[in-house]
Amino acid sequence: MEPFWPRRSPHFLACRRAVRPFLSDREVVIGLSGGADSLALVAAARAEGQAVHAVVVDHQLQPGSDDVAREAARQARRLGARATVTQVRVRPGNLEANARTARYAALRAHNQPVWVAHTRDDQAETLLLQALRGNPGGMAPHQDGITRPFLSIRRADTLQACAELDLHPWHDPHNEDPDFQRVAVRTALEQIHGDPVEPLAQTAERIAADNALLTELAGPPTDDCAELAAQPGPLRRRRIAAWLIERDIRPTRASISMIEDMCTTWHGQGAVRVGGGLEVRRVGGRLALSVEA
């Protein structure tokens, strides 16, 4: 049965317009949580004729997560997408960071272009989250092998698009838990008078563009401490951050600073913990990542 695309659907139209610059002749993997953003992305891509493999990553962190995953896959198939469910194990510790690492590893494992459904609201939240970690920045539409077609539209568009399509998104209880840093930031933004999302998102986009230029000037990630030590500080720190990101590690101001010291003022420092049960050491003049001892 062909999917139903309503004639009068202004919010779904916004979603469809957002994906058009990113359409590919290849099948793309879309990370599908079952929430409104990712359901709307699958729907918009399919409405524009994009071949989609919707991958539902079940983190197994909540009771009934397997039922949620199966329902998300069912709705994706109704939209004309191929859909599979992948279960992952999330390491203990920083639940947000470790779940993200496991999720992206599962999406990349298919060796296809990967799309995720971050919106303009996510862009604003990410700017503040990264600023709190001492490394403010924004998300680019294409970054580290990930495509984000929805950075130009709002979360309200995806919610209303699902209503227009008679889709039934899952509302993750974790999105209401203030113990998660992103939820706390989101709640704080909602309490600010006016709409802070647009100016924050614009700032994030400018930073992302600046970062792209500086990253090009800095050169590719390297573990060579002598090469890093020879660079100006701003480029060196950016290169260290890129080296961590390449390994699915979120850089923080503290971790970058301590790794930088390993390169520039080496005196036998101990390992630097970088989260996820991992640490960085200097071995033979190079940075080495290993499991915490």
Give the positions of each predicted feature:
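AMP-forming adenylation/ATP pyrophosphatase catalytic core
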Residues: 2-37, 53, 57-59, 88, ...
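PAPS/PAP-binding and catalytic site of the sulfotransferase fold
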Residues: 161, 185-192, 236-244
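Short, surface-exposed acidic
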Residues: 170-173, 194-201, 248-257
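Active-site-proximal catalytic alpha-helix in oxidoreductases
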Residues: 178-212
